């Protein structure tokens, strides 16, 4: 069976984990946490990086730092992972779902303004598949209405919008380093932002509401509980694994783009014949080859294709069930306007195997089997 995803060792992961153990500090915020943070600051040209235990927790931190209060409204697409909404629901917010663009599967920037009310406090664009939302327009809207922008860049690490790293354009950006992502620490994430005014509060929030970070810098003689907080700091072993992956960022990118381009070239004729749609990347967007998906005629065709590929030793995967159609989505949110594309396009989409060690022979085989399928 060709797996859908397989985490890879690409560099010095095991050596760095051994070194982390030898350092005698495994609890986090040590050598490798700092190395990861400094690497991202330099690579993505961002002032503040806080490594976290997940992108979910990075989103929760962003919701806290955005001062979301009970009854506030937060705008986002329904086609996203539950964590995007959960982080704000935990603060008592009402989620307002907006339809997506069928070409990128991202939030339709032209529908955001009509969803704004006097209760709206934030917009959460989700950069699906590492392809940027139209951030210039979204930032214009946010500035016009004095709204926070929290970028869900879980899939967008080392992807860019007009030269700017995704996650660094809005007020806050949230990354994922889950094992399914381009760069992994097993479970983990990061919160990034440009405004240094949020640094101290973010430190306290990540360290259980204490000034423990100041204590370790020698700025206070003991640390105390001073505000809201939780435990959002990953261990040094996780950070060590991630740092080895970040060091090989360009190597990982080259291989993933090779796989992505391989699919794209081999399936072009099927798109020309009207049998499927391939991913679309707008001008100004530099994607990171996080995933490769195709879109077929309808749900019935996708269901048949999934069964067919599995019979032939290939593990594809569909993706999100739109949040507004779920029980919690109905309870905690509402859909603004008409669901023209969210449900329809989500039912057409199928993700193909994509990981660092996927061979081009496997790409050839997968493309061949898709060609043999009776659309």
Name every feature range the model reports, one short phrase each.
Residues 26-73, 87-91, 97-99, 164:
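Phosphate-binding glycine-rich loop
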Residues 58, 80, 353:
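Conserved SAM-binding loop
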Residues 64-153, 160:
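PLP-dependent aminotransferase-like
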Residues 34-39, 43-49, 110, 114, ...:
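PLP-dependent aminotransferase class I/II
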Residues 168-211, 236:
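Active-site PLP attachment segment
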Residues 50, 75, 96, 149-150, ...:
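Structural detector of well-ordered beta-strand residues that form the stable sheet scaffold
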Residues 1-27, 224-226, 353:
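N-terminal "arm"/small-domain region of PLP-dependent enzymes with the aminotransferase-like
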Residues 151-185, 214-216, 221-226:
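Conserved active-site segment immediately N-terminal to the catalytic lysine
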């Amino acid at each position: 069976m060709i797996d859908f995803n397989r985490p890879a060792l690409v560099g010095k992961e095991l050596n760095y984990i051994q070194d982390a153990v030898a350092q005698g500090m495994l609890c986090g915020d040590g050598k490798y946490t700092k190395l990861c943070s400094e690497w991202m600051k330099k690579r993505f040209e961002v002032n503040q990086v806080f490594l976290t235990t997940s992108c979910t927790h990075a989103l929760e931190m962003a919701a806290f730092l955005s001062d979301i209060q009970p009854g506030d409204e937060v705008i986002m697409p329904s086609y996203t992972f539950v964590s995007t909404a959960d982080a704000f629901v935990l603060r008592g917010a009402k989620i307002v779902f907006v339809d997506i663009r069928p070409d990128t599967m991202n939030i339709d920037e032209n529908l955001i303004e009509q969803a704004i009310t006097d209760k709206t406090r934030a917009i959460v664009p989700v950069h699906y598949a590492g392809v940027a939302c139209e951030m210039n327009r979204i930032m214009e809207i946010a500035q016009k209405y004095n709204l926070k922008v929290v970028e869900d860049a879980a899939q967008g690490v080392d992807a860019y919008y007009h030269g700017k790293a995704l996650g660094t354009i809005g007020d806050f950006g949230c990354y994922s380093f889950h094992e399914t992502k381009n760069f992994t620490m097993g479970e983990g994430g990061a919160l990034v932002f440009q405004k240094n005014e949020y640094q101290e509060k973010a430190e306290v929030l990540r360290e259980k509401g204490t000034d423990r970070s100041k204590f370790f810098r020698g700025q206070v003689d003991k640390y105390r509980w001073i505000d809201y907080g939780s435990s959002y700091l990953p261990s040094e072993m996780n950070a060590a694994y991630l740092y080895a992956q970040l060091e090989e960022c360009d190597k990982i990118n080259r291989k993933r783009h090779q796989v992505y381009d391989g699919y794209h070239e081999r399936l072009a004729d099927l798109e020309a014949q009207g049998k499927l749609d391939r991913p679309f990347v707008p001008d100004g967007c530099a994607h990171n080859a996080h995933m490769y998906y195709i879109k077929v005629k309808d749900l019935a065709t996708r269901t048949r294709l999934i069964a067919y590929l599995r019979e032939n030793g290939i593990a594809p995967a569909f993706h999100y069930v739109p949040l507004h159609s779920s029980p919690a989505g109905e309870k905690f949110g509402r859909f603004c306007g008409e669901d023209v594309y969210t449900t329809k396009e989500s039912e057409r989409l199928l993700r193909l195997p994509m990981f660092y060690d996927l061979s081009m022979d496997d790409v050839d085989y997968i493309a061949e089997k898709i060609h043999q399928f009776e659309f």
